[in-house]
């Protein structure tokens, strides 16, 4: 684990003092590892913590970067910066998949490239840095990777679900209806298929590792259909 710490520290520019917390942050649930108290060791608990830490640090960062913007605009920026796809892209940028510890089955099924695994492990790593080094250390890591993303967003982004809802309201149509079509895959790596339906258009479906992302993808697909017919 010391070798892993030395290697990953060069990538994330942070060196852990607690090797155990680093190992926990990088351990996929498929390993089914247990500690001396027979408790499962995986990145899931740290993922929960890291999600909250990321949201807080990004919120403060945006508050300082855009002093003239109202709450709604800041919220849209934050939603875009902390969504699953953005987190996964940052994880890919630092090649975090190379460090995730998983069983052979998960690895053979592309687990090291799986976007949900990348998202979860990066959130866990953020949680681990917070526990090991405190708020200042984790702020440096997050700002190093997210500040440039925030600067690239010239205007507050509009998510597809909001855009679709506003389109239906402008055209005096009923609001979009989203429905869970099916859920597949194991509990630690699920895949959700969500459909969306609006009046005068055929139902459209999309798949993603979370219901929220699947809804956004479905909304984006139906917006593309609307653009082609108007």
Swiss-Prot record:
Its main location: cytoplasm. The active site is at residues 51, 123. It is an enzyme of class 3 (hydrolase). Residues 5-134 form the RNase III domain. GO terms for cellular component: cytoplasm. Its cofactor is Mg(2+). Mg(2+) binds at residues 47, 120, 123. InterPro entries: dsRBD_dom, RNase_III, RNase_III_dom, RNase_III_sf. SMART domains: DSRM, RIBOc. The keyword Nucleus does not apply. Its EC number is 3.1.26.3. Gene3D superfamilies: 3.30.160.20, Ribonuclease III domain. GO terms for molecular function: double-stranded RNA binding; metal ion binding; ribonuclease III activity; rRNA binding. CDD domains: DSRM_RNAse_III_family, RIBOc. The keyword Kinase does not apply. Belongs to the ribonuclease III family. This is Ribonuclease 3. The gene is rnc.
């Amino acid at each position: 684990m010391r070798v892993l710490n030395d290697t990953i520290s060069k990538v994330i520019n942070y060196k852990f003092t607690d090797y155990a917390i680093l190992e926990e942050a990088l351990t996929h649930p498929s390993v089914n590892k247990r500690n001396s108290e027979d408790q499962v060791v995986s990145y899931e608990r740290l993922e929960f913590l890291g999600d909250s830490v990321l949201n807080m640090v990004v919120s403060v960062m945006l508050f300082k970067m855009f002093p003239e913007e109202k709450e709604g605009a800041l919220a849209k920026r934050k939603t875009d910066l902390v969504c699953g796809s953005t987190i996964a892209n940052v994880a890919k940028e630092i090649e975090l998949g190379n460090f995730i510890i998983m069983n052979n089955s998960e690895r053979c099924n592309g687990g090291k490239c799986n976007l949900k695994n990348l998202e979860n492990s990066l959130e866990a790593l953020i949680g681990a840095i917070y526990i090991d080094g405190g708020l200042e250390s984790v702020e440096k890591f997050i700002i190093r990777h997210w500040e440039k993303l925030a600067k690239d967003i010239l205007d507050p982004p509009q998510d597809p679900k909001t855009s679709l809802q506003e389109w239906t309201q402008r055209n005096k149509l009923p609001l979009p209806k989203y429905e869970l079509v099916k859920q597949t895959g194991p509990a630690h790596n699920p895949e959700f298929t969500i459909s969306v339906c609006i009046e005068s258009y055929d139902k459209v479906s999309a798949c993603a590792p979370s219901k929220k992302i699947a809804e956004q993808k479905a909304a984006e697909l139906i917006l593309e259909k609307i653009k082609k017919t108007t």
